[in-house]
Amino acid sequence: MLFRSTMLCDIHTGEWDEKLLALLDIPREILPEIKSSSEIYGTFECMGAQLCLAGIAGDQQSALFGQTCFESGEAKNTYGTGCFLLAHTGQRAVESKHGLLTTVVAGEKGRPIEYALEGSVFVGGAVVRWLRDELKLIHDSSDSEYFARKVADSAGVYLVPAFSGLGAPTWDMHARGTILGLTAGTGKNHIIRAALESIAYQTEDVIAAMNADVAALNGGEGSNAISLLKVDGGASANDLLMQMQSDFSAITVQRAANAEATAAGAAFLAGLAVGFFADREELKGLTGAKRSFEPRMSEDERKVRLGGWHRAVSACRKFSESEE
């Protein structure tokens, strides 16, 4: 349902917002009919065959579907150039108080509207590319894990990759990248490890915001909204990064057998529309975990690490204030 990207729709009704149309003097007649993400929209001819156009979704909504996150509390994170985390909230449109977006998830024709909380991290795998292309610390992206494993930790070094500001949940366009905690003993391996840690730290900030939003709805009671994080995307192949994520977020991280969850979601949506797949239960049987990562870090160490990260982010933002 790409209609939401126009900002002219009412996500609660699934219809165009008549008040906004009137305010902006947009005739309702020029807008297309709103359709679900999984139904037959039309046919076209290709090499003499009639083919159906039967599925459409935004890339992250498609990845959520491809990971078969169909129930409230199920979440996925795509580790690409940036990181994009969506947590399903069922038929409840949660209005975030912690810097997240409320989005409509992809679904089939005839189903009730379902929602998710969404948080975007601007620099995910891009920080590894920066290590490779600009600092020349590694020759290939996969080298980052090799060198990061040569040290037990980052030795107090924090890298905040705010190359183009900070995304969710901070949303600070003025922030700029920083490396803090350097000593005479800091080596390239510490910096590489700190770069990988920054991806996991930023993702944990989004997870914490999601948990806080759900806790607020429940009157501050109940367990965290996210206890399992399904992951995909190129950087999800990095075992060390996935273990860091599990440790920093204190949750199980489950790597998909198919790293291309967005493509899988598109195929699932189209397949359901034309009857190639019977239902969502069949889709669940087609997906699975390649590997799971469980938390190994103590809660005390986790709090110390996250505290250092949040101080580094604060210092990064404070430094940038002088440029505003």
Functional labels for PLM-detected ranges:
Residues 1, 6, 35, 89-324:
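Glycine/Thr-rich phosphate-binding loops that ligate phosphate moieties of nucleotide
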Residues 10-12:
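Short beta-strand to alpha-helix junction loop
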Residues 40-51, 55-74, 87-91:
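Conserved phosphate-binding catalytic cores of ATP/NTP-utilizing and phosphoryl-transfer enzymes
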Residues 24-27, 49, 248-251:
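Short, structured coil segments at secondary-structure junctions
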Residues 39, 56-60, 78-82, 227-229, ...:
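A short acidic Gly-Thr/Ser loop motif
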Residues 6-7, 62-65, 83-87, 159:
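Short beta-strand scaffold segments in enzyme catalytic cores
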Residues 75-78, 82-89, 266:
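Gly/Thr-rich phosphate-binding beta-strand-loop-beta motif of the actin/hexokinase/Hsp70
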